[in-house]
Amino acid sequence: MSNKKELLWASRFNEPFDSEALRFSSSVHVDGKLYREDIQGSIAHATMLGEEGIISADDAHAICRGLKEIEKEIETGTLVPQWEDEDIHTVIENRLKEKIGAAAGKLHSGRSRNDQVATDTRLYMRERIEELQEALNDLLGTLVQKAETYKDSIIFGYTHLQRAQPISAGHYYLAYFNMFNRDTERLLDLLMRVNVSPLGAAAFAGSTLPLNAGRTAELLDFSELFTNSIDAVSDRDILIEFISCCSIVMMHLSRFCEDIILWSSYEFGYLEISDAFSTGSSIMPQKKNADIAELIRGKTGRVYGDLMAMLTIMKGLPLSYNRDMQEDKPPLFDSAETAISSVTLFNRMLQHTRLREERLKELTKKDLSLATEIAEYLVKKDVPFRDAHRITGKIVSWSIENQTPLPDIPLERFREFSEVFDEGIFTALTPEASITSKKSHGSCSFESVERQIREARELLG
């Protein structure tokens, strides 16, 4: 192999490109990840060129054979891109020239690096969307299993991080099921826009060669073909949308991780994480830290940064292609890899968590979270809700001042606040009764949770 690095555009210039400028502008250390997609796109392009008679069938065959050999060389480490190569497209084309000679120069007929890299990026995103979908579907399955396991367990529901009302633990897990399911729907919707071939747009204005863009789209399994050559090479909105989807996934993970971190702390003590997903302290022997959950929570900020980076890169660019767009790869790769690995590891961690049901049972029995049941009990007695709310607030205040749990307040004391109280109030003041009595659609009642679990299982097939 020759050590001479030939830049694809150098013939126009009388002076060699400054070495520091080349090092600064080289992207091969980043876009090297796209070698499979680049070779896949080039094979499709060469096949089409041969079929359309733009190049000979022999040249097309030689190009495709050489590209497949180069793919193996990169995979085995025989061919290692260097920064002097500028980008992965240059690496592959220069190596192809070394392997098959002048025929390699025909590969780029009717093609620009602009539509080439746009194609590579879409192929990459298509694969990452499928991987992220698969990871999310696995997580959805775990959430349904958790909901089934803990459907009869009672935990606190929170607002403002204050205990609010008792709920079925299954209802809690199903809340996250719905969030992550919407993430899969967003990705599926995005896939329709990603799966559009830009190959054939050339630099931005098309080509005078009789390219068959529909054929390359077919060979690359794209479902649609671009309609405007400028748009095909100059926008990165689908990339931004993908990172946005990753950001929402990470936001949902981060919220879930926050619950796990809090609930596994000594102060809460609701949940236990397996030792396999916990770490200790180098100085405090007693520590058991939820580091994996904390790391996922921290990585969320990084993916948000990827989204802001892309929005900022694109915000002032005139049509069509600009070299600024080279900077789209680090945010894309980072957000995809972070989201996929985070969902995968979170799912494994979640599978190895358990609720501390005995502690939760004791806490929910004697808690102020049953106050709403008093207010709704009064409403059922034909007391206007605002009056019921005011009366219940006074009862709660008395309960706190006298250190008496709501279920332990004597009936005569209840009747001092309102004469409509009778023995039925004590039937309502249990966590089980609170949950069972919920009648509204999608509520936390045990019956509703059972229905939600069935629907979730049907959704997953």
UniProtKB/Swiss-Prot annotation:
EC number: 4.3.2.1
UniProt main location, coarse: cytoplasm
Swiss-Prot/TrEMBL catalytic activity: 2-(N(omega)-L-arginino)succinate = fumarate + L-arginine
EC class (word): lyase
Keyword Acetylation: no
Pathway given in the UniProt record: Amino-acid biosynthesis; L-arginine biosynthesis; L-arginine from L-ornithine and carbamoyl phosphate: step 3/3
Gene Ontology terms, MF aspect: argininosuccinate lyase activity
Presence of the UniProt keyword Cell cycle in the record: no
GO CC terms, sorted: cytosol
Keywords (A to Z) from UniProt: Amino-acid biosynthesis, Arginine biosynthesis, Cytoplasm, Lyase
Family: Belongs to the lyase 1 family. Argininosuccinate lyase subfamily.
UniProt-recorded name of the protein: Argininosuccinate lyase
Organism annotation: Chlorobium luteolum (strain DSM 273 / BCRC 81028 / 2530) (Pelodictyon luteolum)
Lineage: Bacteria, Pseudomonadati, Chlorobiota, Chlorobiia, Chlorobiales
Gene: argH
